[in-house]
Amino acid sequence: MNTVRVTFLLVFVLAVSLGQTDKDENRMEMQEKTEQGKSYLDFAENLLLQKLEELEAKLLEEDSEESRNSRQKRCIGEGVPCDENDPRCCSGLVCLKPTLHGIWYKSYYCYKK
């Protein structure tokens, strides 16, 4: 019976002492994994940032192309009254005071340049 107690006590002491080293090793492994995880997260963050910048550049490029190719909107055609201070005549037209017809309206009209 005494040998069983001694054996149990010996196994208990060994388990506790080896368990402590395992705990320290586990803690060190966890620290290494978190450091690796941080570096992986930094890498993933940089990769995502690059993709977002590329996407933003493409979107800005499409916007600039669209504005270059879009036609002029809400402009006043030839022979239509316009405001002298805020002419909205289409391209190729100028807001001028009429020479012959329309002088009694005291208004400006869009004419070709």
Swiss-Prot record:
GO terms, molecular function: sodium channel inhibitor activity; toxin activity
Disulphide linkage map: 75-90, 82-95, 89-110
Signal peptide: 1-21
Location in or out of the cell: Secreted
Keywords noted in UniProt: Disulfide bond, Ion channel impairing toxin, Knottin, Secreted, Signal, Toxin
Gene Ontology CC: one annotated term: extracellular region
Record's function text: Probable ion channel inhibitor.
Entry protein name: U11-theraphotoxin-Hhn1a
Lineage, uppermost ranks: Eukaryota, Metazoa, Ecdysozoa, Arthropoda, Chelicerata
